[in-house]
Amino acid sequence: SRRYLNKKLNFFKKLIISTDGYIALAGASTSKSIGVLNIGTGVVAHFMNKNKISQQLSGWGFPYGDKGGGWWIGLKMIQATLRAIDGYNNNGDIIIKKTLNIIGKKDLKILNWISKSESRKLAKLSKVFFSVKSKSFIHNSILKEGIYEIEMILKYMIEEKKIRKIFLLGSISKFYINYIKKKYL
């Protein structure tokens, strides 16, 4: 908490608390506008214009934000799997099979897995998601929704805020790069 930090770091004349994304951006920024889009467990973008005015996009965290990030992909996989178990989703889909192999195939085991899930645990499912070579309807649906969110962030940074140099970071960005429209790269 802020009070704890102030107590432990009270020997500084002035204490400024900021995000790691902002600090990385400030360190990398010269006199030009620059941005960073980090796609990992979550999704967060930071940009700074040439006047050193900065803004953060997304990064609201689990379970409310970071659409397109690893935890969100994992959640979408779980939701699709639960619908398949209930009988109104394609239970033969490769995503369903792979998800069931991880979370279990019996109701009690599934309930136990999801009751203990948190952002990092869900994000681990995204590795399975991106390892699927034979694409499926569910895979394509989740991927399309994630790409849309990533592109909306990039579009805002490029078209609205005129940020011309954006670095893609994070463990999942390397998978999205092949799907993002060229005009945003």
Over which residues does each language-model region extend?
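Phosphate-binding/catalytic loop of phosphoryl-transfer enzymes
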Residues: 1-91
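ATP-binding/phosphotransfer module of carbohydrate and carboxylate kinases, centering on a glycine-rich
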Residues: 3-6, 28-33, 78-185
